[in-house]
Amino acid sequence: ADVLALLARTDPDRSKTHRGLSLFIVTKPRGGGHGFQFTQEAGAADRVGKMEGRAIDTIGYRGMHSYEVALEDWWVPAENLIGEQDGIGKGFIFQMAGFENGRLQTAARAVGVMQAAYEAALDYAQNRVVFGNPIGDYQLTQAKLGRMAVLIQAGRQFAYVVARMMANGEGATEAAMVKAYVCKAAEWVTGEAM
């Protein structure tokens, strides 16, 4: 990405806890690979800025990486403060709102994982022959595949409802609920598919 969302302490009074944090958009060069190291020309403090990032290993996230980022003397212009002057001290609130979207995204990703597991299990059930019949002909296999399909559809529809709520500025609690439900369902579906 060409930008980072950076939650930074803007009030040195640590007794303000999360109320002393602000959220900034920080531009950076596009990096190649799973780590990066950049320097920035001397900024307002007349010091060369440094930014270094390394990917954090995560299970199941392909095409999307989490990074540990270290900044030293990296200059960010005041206009990059989210919420302009009214955003000072509100960064934590803004960040939490962003996490709500992340919860919905995690639920949607889990629906995709369940769908892929179901399709693999269905293919296996149709092609694995035991005692002269595909195992998909047996009642227990049919019941498991049926339950998988129900959980997938329920998770998908729940995610759609929450997405509509969030588009209307609602659904913070429901975003947490759909993530919890769909991820738990995905555990069962993928376990049974194996």
Locate each region found by the language model.
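Solvent-exposed alpha-helices and their adjacent loops that cap or buttress functional pockets
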Residues: 1, 14-18, 59-63, 86-87
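Short clusters of hydrophobic/aromatic residues that line enzyme substrate/ligand-binding pockets
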Residues: 52-56, 61, 81-82, 95, ...
